């Protein structure tokens, strides 16, 4: 039996955390939003806010112990995961588990789990702890290769390298954009995939698993640009993706929504990455599903029923990005952006801008995917950012 209201403490307060906070408050929860900077998006709608360095173990422990939440919901990768394990040992519920957060915060740990222990199909890969090691490991994978920090946010620090001459620059980019204490990179073969998908996987308290219809998406510089749902998969591809997602989420345990990413290469389904939380490509569910990914996350976390997940025939999202630095942002063009039926625009409330920063998202439904994607693209293009220093 779930007793409400619960007290929810969010570690990370960006646009995804903001939607988690809204979903929690609609269930009567008291929300404490934490992040490393003030006035983060989720803080704007939360009951309370805390600013702290979340990689600081003592600071994180102090905040959580002072608030005594029902659940702690991590929403970012850069956390003092040893503190989460300590809190879990004290009887606090960490979503989905402290181990899941620790394993998935670094690409090497989740890749070793998936490719090694669980024997899931992945791209060929190697690790390098220096530029010299990168030069030694990359050629065996064939050119081009993809170089990534083992820990980063929103695809930052990723490079596609066509030959040995680009490896030093790729190493520097990875180190400059690495989060936490990351000191090495993962280098992967470049997959010529047909489609990249996210399978939102909901693990409930009783261990049962539900799936949302697959979400197709496109990235640039490792960061999501647009997504659409449902993505077209064969029955065989969908069955394989669901089986792999169930295998890895069962291993990680706990309750909540996971964003499990795959590459589709011909008939093959290849595991890519996993986030133990709502996924940026899943923003499309704000318009596509009867229960969006944030509502599904909260229902699973709190042990509430999920009777059915229904999806529109065609829906799409397109991000709205900043193109320069500034500390004051205003928007125009919303009249044009919202003039078509079944469209919506979410502005995230970020006060500062920088090139490539995600400031909002346009959403649309259509009779078919081409129409939905075109509507989302037009809506996003109509929004103009005015950025001042």
From Swiss-Prot:
E.C. designation(s): 6.3.1.21
GO cellular component: cytosol
Gene3D superfamilies: 3.40.50.20, ATP-grasp fold, A domain, ATP-grasp fold, B domain
Superkingdom field: Bacteria
ATP-grasp domain span: 112-302
Residues binding Mg(2+): 261, 273
Record GO biological process: 'de novo' IMP biosynthetic process
Protein name: Formate-dependent phosphoribosylglycinamide formyltransferase
Organism: Synechococcus sp. (strain WH7803)
Origin organism lineage: Bacteria, Bacillati, Cyanobacteriota, Cyanophyceae, Synechococcales
